[in-house]
């Protein structure tokens, strides 16, 4: 079993912790709690760089090693880092899901990359414009953190 953790922080009140677990070469389980969000859906993605020197902006674009368009976590054709939306109620998003495309090892590894929670709902690449195919029109980056191995 390989485990990783990400502590999310931003310039405002949004903060959280997300944990990742992978058994052998199976799907990755993603479990987290993010506080300080407005109620509703917020895009949640893995971005390329583990660089937060300029806040969440320096994390770069979505992790996309196969050079595909943005999509839903259920789409075969999507960025590896496209994890869809997390839903906040009462300012808190608590979630647990599995994802078949991210990994904690190998060429699709998210270790050392940045997890980002966004201001708006991710349209899952169905928005009908160029930005939808890049970012899902998820808006600004509220909080982020570098993903690292943990015991």
Curated annotation (Swiss-Prot):
UniProt family annotation: Belongs to the Cu-Zn superoxide dismutase family.
Q: Where in the cell is it found?
A: Cytoplasm; Nucleus
Q: How does it assemble?
A: Homodimer, and heterodimer of Superoxide dismutase [Cu-Zn] A and B.
Which organism is this entry from?
Xenopus laevis (African clawed frog)
Mind telling me which SUPFAM superfamilies this protein's record contains? Cu,Zn superoxide dismutase-like (SSF49329)
Q: Which cysteines are joined by disulfide bonds?
A: 56-144
User: In which residues is Zn(2+) bound?
Assistant: 62, 70, 79, 82
Give the EC number(s) under which this enzyme is classified.
1.15.1.1
Residues binding Cu cation, per UniProt = 45, 47, 62, 118
CDD domains, alphabetized = Cu-Zn_Superoxide_Dismutase
Any one GO molecular-function label of the UniProt entry: superoxide dismutase activity
- The protein here is known as Superoxide dismutase [Cu-Zn] A
Identify the coding gene: sod1-a
